[in-house]
Amino acid sequence: MLGAEAALVTAGSAAGLVLQAAACIAGDDPSRIARLPDVTGMRHEFVIQRPHRFSYDQSFRVPGGVLVEIGLGRRTMPYELENAIGPATAGAVYLVSPFTSPPGILSFDEVCRIAHARGVPVLVDVASMVPPRENLFRYLRDGADLVIVSGGKGIRGPQSTGILAGRRDLIRAATLNASPNQAIGRAAKTSKEEIVGLVTALELFLAEDEKAEMERYREVCASIVAGLGEVPGIRAVVEQDPVNRVLPHAVLYFEPSWTGPSGRAVQLALAAGDPHVYVQQGPHQGGYFDEIAIDAINLEPGDEAIIVRRLLEELTRR
């Protein structure tokens, strides 16, 4: 379904990262698999650009991996990746996630070119960036050796699942490092029910009309923006772009003239209220400034009215 040589259902994306790392460190060698996380004598370093460090990259450390950072916060030069790759390098990590790829860092294509020229596999985490459905295929097609995708986010399969797809030899190695084998991935077991549930969800997901889906999300976001009306100091818009907001979002920008509570204060109040409303907020959660962003993917019909009501309650609270 994904156009990959092979694939494996994992116990979520984080478990998929563990198996990615284990496959690149120990391969399919039984003696090495049994030794993890002792990586003595094995390639175990994973090169990653500084802006691509993320909350789950500790998963690479579980089987004994070590992350090697390159670049600055908003810039990476090709020579930095070239110089970082050495005898201990097991892989190059590339994160596809909102607000993590400023224009000055190495692109996916550049990472693939440099890493592959030195015999190093490229590992891609695209867990939170599906839809668009194209992301299921693009990175495998364009050079990734392994790609991890969440089964429970946009695909809407079991929340405890993920998909690890890529080169046949690396998927075989990941499988040998996983349950039911007595290996580093034994604790991250997937049941037959989860596997069937994810495969079924993926089939349904691929059969959906993405254009119509995006239009629904856009309409929901437009309804939220319209419902807010004119709040002095707040600029509400619908945004979508191919990098940072791949789905339509209703975004509230706090203008310099705004004199009310901060975006963070509004976010916390929304989460603590009745009903609980969870929104994205500010740069620490993937954003530009002190804005609030609302993703429509998990909303049911009628939820937008509740969101508008709660937003207005908190924005006008004095």
Describe the predicted segments one by one.
Residues G227-T316:
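Conserved C-terminal alpha-helix-loop-beta "cap" of PLP-dependent enzymes
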Residues E213-Y217:
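Shared catalytic-loop signature of beta/alpha-barrel
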Residues G3-L206, E210, V220, V225-G229, ...:
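Conserved PLP-enzyme active-site core in the AAT-like
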